[in-house]
Amino acid sequence: LAFAGLTGNENVWDLYCGIGTISLFLSQKAKQVYGVEIVPQAIEDAKNNAKLNGITNAQFFVGKAEEVLPQFYENAKKTEKITDDTASTGRTDMLRPDVIVVDPPRKGCDEKCLDTMLAMSPERIVYVSCDSATLARDLKILCEEKYELMKWQAFDQFREAHPQAQLQR
């Protein structure tokens, strides 16, 4: 929550949102949160979690982040008659989010997703990663374009778990 720098007026996209844990937490301090997840049951759970907790400022979409976000962005640009050149002068709630949070699988973010995030040009991107190699790869892309790494914090996401595998025959 601290990394997102929310004050209550921000519009946030949460990509790879799962059951909405981060989305619903962020909704406490955001104007609106939009979550995207590929697993339909996870989105149903996110919607149920929002309802159970009386959260009304979170919306959830089923699909791959690398498909949903670009499709939404292109459709919204047409609807709002915004071009890439003029889009940076003003924000619209969903088209120009203040913050994008990503918590991708180990493979990291898809290139199309990263490109769309860059086009949407949020003030902040919060990247949660379970793979340091794909984190480094994706940060390189984001930082080469327009962002600067301001804060980072390492923590063990999988307590007492080791990412090694043993194969036996």
Where are these regions (language model features)?
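Rossmann-like S-adenosyl-L-methionine
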Residues: 1-169
